[in-house]
Amino acid sequence: MESKAEVKADGRTERATAIRAERRAHILESAIRTFSEKGYHQTSIADIVEAAGVARGTFYLYFESKSTVFLALLDELLAHLRANVVGVEVGPGAAPLGAQLLDIVRRVLRTALEKRALADIIFREAIGLDEEVDQKLRAFYGSLHRFLMEALLMGQQGGAVRGTLDVDATASCILGSIKQVLEQYLVHTAERDFDVERFAQAIVQYNLNGVLAR
């Protein structure tokens, strides 16, 4: 049984941990605003510190550099996106493959919309920024490509997808469609309303059914 002193100490530790987490999150949110306004390369640590209203020393308690802030933001976005990519179900009672893919694409697009400012920064600034960022993006897109391939392979095994389909190339096409829609409508035309359902339907219908009348 814990003593009162131990319980009190545990409480202080929990509060300190919560405060640190809140302060770190606040710095990251301030960095998102600053990167959005100025761009990554034009933003300095001083800009982030000023936006966050913290001392420079406080910043360095949480982050080593501007690039580590960017990596933390990238990790946050990728974690949210990964959480929405779930396995495809097969067998009796499972929803049709198209419906399952639609649900996954819909949730990925919705997550990007909810994290729009962050997604905007990643798409505008991440490519070619440094090797670690490139590795993280390659790993994420690679995992999403493998997931799509596996879903199509299961569709072939279940008879929902034709056996002659090149699942590797098709998975790349689906992934490319998602990336292009996000880049075009969340970044380059950010002032437009982004209709998640419209684009999720278009991505899945185009990649699974094509455009020719049947």
Task: Spell out what each predicted region is.
Residues 100, 113-132, 180-187:
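Amphipathic alpha-helical segments used for helix-helix packing
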Residues 1-38, 43-54, 68:
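Basic, helix-initiating cap at the start of DNA-binding domains
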Residues 1-10, 106-110, 114, 146, ...:
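C-terminal peripheral helix-coil segments that are non-catalytic and often amphipathic
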